[in-house]
């Protein structure tokens, strides 16, 4: 039994009930009480609160041969939306998703050439996606930005060779966007976010390794149900591990880095050289 103040216990129980409805959708009040070990009175009170907040919907009765048919509860995944942004070297991509992570819209823009234009471009992108949320109860409830760099204690750092137009380490995007929209804004390494997404929506495992390969290479890890980033956030920065001593020259100044053999540009170059066709594209593979 959870001990503590009534408010804390209520909050924890409310969270547990909502999570169970999300994971077992649809579900009856009776089954919620049985699965969570809570009294029917507690379940009824919490469910009524969630119904009042429009986070849960009653969607009809369960089929049963005996007794009163239980009313089924379903998570209202359209009650709010989130925006996920991938801040790439040349393209900024955004996805608008409902509260279950199902995509409602995708958009992309060119990455601005000048850092001072980045905030304005992001605001324009976000505002262009707000229209689809007009009928939802809570609208946009959060924004997440994935970057191709390291995030540690909200501080952003990049490898020294990253081009200046993608360096947003001197822009306080979290503060700027939170002041504009009054909702939580998060910034994290894109591979870490991929790992979190895989763990949250698709995986039944407590340990996950998610490898992202594009112009660079990075690794996101969930270990024992927790995102693992290392002491300084560099745990997944594997692109500049030397795998071939005295190998190909890398933009970081070393030789034989993993990115020189497995990143998309390096794979395309190898493919172009092999088929004797300059500037091969991904579509050619």
Where are each of the predicted segments found?
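Glycine-rich phosphate-binding loop and adjoining helix at the ATP-binding site
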Residues: 103, 107-123, 127-207
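Gly/Thr-rich phosphate-binding beta-strand-loop-beta motif of the actin/hexokinase/Hsp70
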Residues: 67-106, 210-223
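Conserved phosphate-binding catalytic cores of ATP/NTP-utilizing and phosphoryl-transfer enzymes
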Residues: 58-80, 185-210
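Extreme N-terminal segment that seeds HTH/winged-HTH DNA-binding domains in transcriptional regulators
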Residues: 1-34
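N-terminal helix-turn-helix
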Residues: 25-58
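Glycine-rich phosphate-binding loop of actin/hexokinase-like ATP-binding domains
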Residues: 205-261
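A mobile "lid/hinge" subdomain adjacent to the ATP/sugar-phosphate binding pocket shared
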Residues: 256-285
């Amino acid at each position: 039994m959870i001990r503590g103040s009534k408010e804390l216990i209520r909050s924890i129980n409310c969270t547990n009930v909502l999570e169970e409805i999300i994971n077992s959708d649809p579900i009856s009040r009776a089954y919620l009480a049985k699965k969570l070990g809570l009294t029917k009175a507690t379940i009824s009170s919490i469910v009524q609160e969630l119904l009042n907040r429009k986070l849960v919907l009653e969607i009809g009765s369960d089929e049963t041969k005996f007794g009163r048919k239980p009313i089924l509860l379903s998570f209202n995944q359209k009650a709010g939306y989130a925006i996920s942004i991938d801040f790439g070297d040349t393209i900024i991509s955004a996805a608008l998703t409902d509260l279950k992570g199902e995509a409602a819209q995708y958009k992309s823009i060119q990455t601005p050439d000048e850092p001072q234009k980045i905030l304005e471009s992001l605001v324009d992108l976000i505002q262009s996606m707000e229209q689809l949320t007009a009928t939802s109860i809570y609208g946009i409830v959060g924004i997440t930005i994935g970057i191709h760099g390291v995030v540690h204690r909200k501080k952003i750092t990049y490898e020294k060779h990253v081009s200046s137009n993608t360096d947003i380490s001197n822009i306080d995007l979290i503060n700027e966007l939170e002041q504009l929209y009054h909702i939580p804004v998060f910034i994290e390494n894109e591979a870490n976010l991929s790992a979190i997404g895989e763990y949250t929506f698709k995986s039944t495992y407590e340990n996950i390794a998610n490898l992202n390969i594009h112009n660079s290479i990075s690794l996101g890890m969930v270990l024992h149900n927790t995102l693992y980033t290392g002491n300084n956030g560099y745990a997944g920065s594997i692109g500049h591990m030397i795998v071939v001593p005295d190998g190909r020259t890398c933009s970081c100044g070393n030789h034989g880095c993993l990115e020189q053999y497995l990143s998309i540009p390096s794979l395309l170059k190898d493919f172009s050289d092999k088929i004797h066709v300059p500037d091969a594209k991904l579509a050619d593979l």
